[in-house]
Amino acid sequence: MTSNVAYLDESTAAGWERTLYAFLAEKQRRSDSLRTVQSYQRMLHDFFGRSGKTPDLVETQDVFAWAYGVGLSGRQPSSITIGARLACVSSFYRFLIRMKIISSNPCDPLERPKALPGAPRGLTGAQIKRLLDVVPGTPVGLRDRAIILTLVMTGRRRTEVISLKAGSLSIEDRVYYTYRGKGGKTGKRELPPPAVEAINSWLACSGRSLEVMAPDDSLWPNLKSGLAITSGTFYTNLRRYLKAAGLQSGGVHLFRHSAAKLRRDAGETVEEVSSFLDHSSLAVTSTYLRRLEGQEDRSWEKVAAAVGILAT
């Protein structure tokens, strides 16, 4: 590919680095997701580091070899990983084309593999109780218990809960929390009392309280550093709790599934669950719940009777 340099100087490695950071800055502004930007940054640095080429010299086979190649884990990439790699590199090249820096995208000839999503699952109320029963009464355990209850009671996503700060909570006639969700969507909702009580217990155990914490203080600080824990820290602990409770391993999103299913089981309508989850449409929620609950077969008895294996 030939380089059609616009206002950025790509004649040096430093110039290309500035272009990369310009792309990441735009990506963060558009997606409002630091996690997405960090993921793109890691993948792009890995790709260009392995290829040893500047963006204007990259060819389709370079992208293919990297996307389908073994990563740092030493394992063959899944279809989801391959798709994410291709999407990342392609997005960067679309940016370069829009900026009139290059004229073509080396990802265009490549087809993304079909990813078969795993069936979502949620924990039952009894399973969540089993899980909470194995969480220790230590300061870390009380913190993790508060996180679990906040996830289950609010149905918010992992990053939305982990990023909560003292200033995210407001005490009025009830306790409310503000959040920034997917796509930059913001909201203010009641924080159910079980989550409030768990948070207060955890903060009291660690010598903190909402009344004296600074607005920017994380609700989930590391006991040693005082800095906010990462979602990876919580996930590591969660895996241990699930194993101790005799439950199947799963990610943090398991609690969003659980929250949706428990609300539905409690009698909420699809419309109410959709609003609870901040879904973009009822169709999204209907599909979400159908995959969680399974679809009832109301005609199997008639079919069985027709073939003579069940008496009517």
List the predicted regions and their residue ranges.
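Conserved catalytic core of the tyrosine transesterase superfamily
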Residues: 1-312
